UniProtKB/Swiss-Prot annotation:
Its EC number is 2.3.1.47. Homodimer. InterPro entries: Aminotrans_II_pyridoxalP_BS, Aminotransferase_I/II_large, AON_synthase_class-II, AONS_Archaea/Proteobacteria, PyrdxlP-dep_Trfase, PyrdxlP-dep_Trfase_major, PyrdxlP-dep_Trfase_small. Substrate binds at R21, H129. The lineage of its organism: Bacteria, Bacillati, Bacillota, Bacilli, Bacillales. This is Putative 8-amino-7-oxononanoate synthase 2.
Length: 386
């Protein structure tokens, strides 16, 4: 069999299972294939990616430093904007220091592949993001998975590994597919009791949770040993970061391969991100309005009979069941002007395919009415939840 023939056979199996994926082209923020759409799948929770203040900051930095960084941070790619942003992130996360990565994915891999060592053990939540899973696979430490936000199971497993050199608990702050919040206060208490270090990935919590938008640390009033995050969601730009002690950041700068061998973020992105953090701390009313929209949508969908999950976050998973029905539901929603793609295995467990809604701060009551009316219509057309 030739190379392409072999791959086509594998792709055919993916198609038969209803898991085939394609790209869609966004012509503007509101149009797909020339038609106006309401996008309910964006991670731009606070609408900052379109904020003129961020755009102006990026343009100003680009005119001075150029379109790209031209190298790694350790060679020629380090600018004043990279360092200013790292100081801002550290202040925002209430840590001593921070270090930028080209994405949140690379931040997780860089931390987990370099920090735990042979003889150590990582205790990882069952629903952690793929970047955490991959980072654990690259680590020299053993990984033990505990049941999703099950503190009794975590404690049982912590108690069983007391003979190991070091214990690391790694968790998403907000889980991207379920919208649930890790009980970080209880995790920190267990870590203290069983002498473990805590690594929290705050990708979906930064800017959204907590009085000042500081994430799960702000929400629970605790401080993990390591905080990982991304700039590509509520911050409205792109890139990732790790935050913690000065010594930890110095360690990453010398040991994290995904930092050492990456091309630095463009200075324009750093300037825009720096501006975003200045704005986020003052968006108290925006966060409250966002929470109000989330509660309204969840209540309406649940009243229709949909199985709705999620915590106090902008992520609303609407469980459909099998993958093919979820794809059909997404297609019908799109015909009604609602862009909300189906999420299927391997991103979620078998039998739990879903429409994953994300609510952003720019949603009006009319938008919410149109969304919930569309869901009521597809429920009847597909005989969902009957």
């Amino acid at each position: 069999m030739d190379f392409d023939g072999w791959l086509l056979g594998r792709l055919d199996a993916v198609k038969r299972d209803g898991l085939y994926r394609t790209l869609r082209t966004q012509e503007t923020a509101l149009k797909t294939k020339g038609q106006k759409r309401q996008t309910w799948a964006s991670n731009d929770y606070l609408g900052l990616s379109k904020d003129e203040r961020l755009i102006t900051a990026a343009q100003t930095a680009m005119s001075r430093f150029g379109a790209g960084s031209g190298g790694s941070r350790l060679t020629t790619g380090n600018t004043v904007w990279h360092e200013k942003l790292e100081h801002t992130i550290a202040d925002f996360k209430q840590t001593e220091a921070a270090l930028l990565f080209s994405s949140g994915y690379l931040a997780n891999i860089g931390v987990l592949a370099s920090l735990p060592q042979k003889g150590d053990v990582i205790l990882s939540d069952q629903l952690n993001h793929a970047s955490i899973v991959d980072g654990c696979r690259l680590s020299k430490a053993e990984t033990i998975v505990y049941r999703h936000i099950d503190m009794a199971d975590l404690e049982k497993k912590l108690a069983s590994v007391q003979a190991r050199n070091r214990r690391f608990i790694v968790t998403d702050g907000v889980f991207s597919m379920d919208g649930t919040i890790a009980p970080l206060d209880r995790i920190m208490a267990l870590a203290k009791q069983y002498q473990a270090f805590v690594i929290a990935d705050d990708a979906h919590a930064t800017g959204v949770l907590g009085e000042n938008g500081g994430g799960t640390s702000d929400y629970f009033g605790v401080c993990p040993d390591v905080v990982i995050g991304t700039l590509s969601k509520a911050v409205g730009t792109e890139g990732g970061f790790a935050a913690g002690s000065n010594i930890f950041i110095d360690f990453l700068l010398n040991q994290a391969r995904t930092f050492i061998f990456q091309t630095a973020l463009p200075p324009s992105i750093c300037a825009a991100s720096h501006t975003a953090f200045d704005i986020i701390s003052d968006m108290h009313d925006t966060r409250r309005e966002l929470q109000s929209s989330v509660k309204m949508i969840k209540t309406r969908l649940a009243d229709m009979g949909f199985t709705v999950r999620g915590g106090d976050t902008p992520i609303i998973p609407v469980i459909i069941g099998d993958a093919k029905t979820a794809v059909s539901a997404a297609a019908l929603l799109e015909k009604k002007g609602i862009c909300a793609p189906a999420i299927r295995p391997p991103a979620v467990p078998e039998g739990e395919s879903r429409i994953r809604l994300t609510v952003t701060a720019d949603r009006s009551l009319q938008d919410i009415d149109e969304l919930t009316e569309a869901f009521d219509s597809i429920r009847k057309e597909l005989n969902i939840n009957k």
